[in-house]
Amino acid sequence: MNILKSLISLSLITFISRILGFMRDLLIAYSFGASGITDAFFLAFKIPNLFRRIFAEGAFSQVFIPILSEYKNNKNIELTRNFISNILGLMIIILSLFTAFGIYFANDIVKICAPGFINSHEKLYLATKMLKIMFPYIFFVSLGSLTGSILNAWNYFSVPAYSSIFLNLSMIMFISFVTAYFNPKILSLAWAVIVGGVFQILYQFPYLKNINMLIFPKFNILNLGVLKFLKQIGIVALGMSVNQVSIIIATISSSFLISGSISWIYYSDRLVEFISGIFGVSLSTILLPLLSKSVNNINIKEYSRLLNWALRLVCILVIPSIIILFTLSESLITLLFKYGAFTYNDVIMTKNVIEFYSIGLLPFVLIKILLAGFYSIRNVKTPMKISIFILVLTQLMNIFFIKYFQYTSFALAISLASWINFFLLYRKLCQSEFFIPSTNWLRFLLKIFAAAMVMLILLFINKNLILSANTHSIFFKILRLFYICASSGGGYLFTLFCLGLRFNHFYLKSYKY
């Protein structure tokens, strides 16, 4: 398998999905702005997404894929099918109970996550109503994660990536054509989430049938694979939930601040997740099955080679992205969201959050790579312990910063904590018997730093010359931003080329650790 080709393909699909996500957010911003009702929607939307990141994209896939990889490589097909069938049965039971619990206690969950809403009847009512509608999304997206993990184990990386497009398409269609039939109109978004969740899982069924893995559920908790899964899932879920608890605490704080705070944080998250999704999620998705295979084959050299390759590739790609995001944040937000009810004040408020998030964007992505390294060697306790420490540290910093930075305090706190998180994880992984760190990191980083400085100079020159011209044409705005990014990015790549870095160095077959 050509890993770099798979990564480019997966990143391109993720890019398309994120662009559709921006179109979705543009329509939301145009239709509803950044107000109390959008705060209610984004809170209600955030809660199932927090649990999705814990159960679906987080703990589940990190534990399930290494065990499935072991079955696929070392067991026969019937044992593998039986393991998947029992995991499916277990998930359906747990998710059904959890969904029923969430719907029944929706009002209490909203009050816990956003106590500031208690004083606003409209916000509380809308958030509760929309949460009841959207909570089943956890059920569908978690089952979609199961099917996606199976397909990833068979190297069908692009199929699960395409499934995320359905949520964005559903919301775009509902905003464009169905909103008028709802009162209040924003309720249409909640139903769009459910429709998108259903299509996310149905779309993958034909591909499961192609690999003979479209299986009916069973329930045997004594299955050896299931027992191994249950032994690890609790620890990983705890570690994954720590980050989400941190976000919930930040949401609680934001609910007491000026109206629109939750919305500004949401829109800034979208831009940050655009970069982390294209590079971090795509790379870790491909990396985890490959690392698990190298561990199952007791191939430490290949394991180290994969991790070192991924870490260096992240640095090459993410550092220039951070520079662009930080330097052009106001222009990007204006282009993406400043329409209709979304005002210039909303642009500035969102920009302030993005600038603090940019500080921690590189470790955000690097941590995803390191976690794949830990989970592939079945070390789930170390990331969990570190994440608990980081949770406490983040909240202490947030308490200190909120007095000075208000709604941007959490972005600053989590960015600084992410650097500490990265260094702790990297140090622990270097101490393991599996990972041999790459040499010449300092020389490599100095080359990137030099290229980044050239890029930054070009960005400022182009920004002052080109962005000073006022225009109301969206096409011209897109064109000039594309030119600024392309010319500055070209300078970055040319500098790296002059310093001796070549694209073919990152073909994995020729990469040396």
From Swiss-Prot:
Topology within the bilayer: Multi-pass membrane protein
GO molecular function: lipid-linked peptidoglycan transporter activity
Top-level taxon of the source organism: Bacteria
This protein's record includes keyword Metal-binding: no
GO terms under cellular component: plasma membrane
Disulfide bonds: none
Cellular compartment(s): Cell inner membrane
Pfam families: MurJ
Transmembrane segments: 3-23, 25-45, 83-103, 133-153, 162-182, 186-206, 221-241, 245-265, 271-291, 313-333, 354-374, 382-402, 405-425, 441-461, 481-501
GO biological process, one term: lipid translocation
Pathway linked to the protein: Cell wall biogenesis; peptidoglycan biosynthesis
Listed InterPro entries: Lipid_II_flippase_MurJ/MviN (IPR051050), MurJ (IPR004268)
Main location, first listed in the record: membrane
Keyword vocabulary terms for this entry: Cell inner membrane, Cell membrane, Cell shape, Cell wall biogenesis/degradation, Membrane, Peptidoglycan synthesis, Transmembrane, Transmembrane helix, Transport
Family statement drawn from the similarity comment of this UniProt entry: Belongs to the MurJ/MviN family.
PANTHER family listed in its UniProt record: LIPID II FLIPPASE MURJ
Role: Involved in peptidoglycan biosynthesis. Transports lipid-linked peptidoglycan precursors from the inner to the outer leaflet of the cytoplasmic membrane.
Protein name: Probable lipid II flippase MurJ
Organism annotation: Buchnera aphidicola subsp. Baizongia pistaciae (strain Bp)
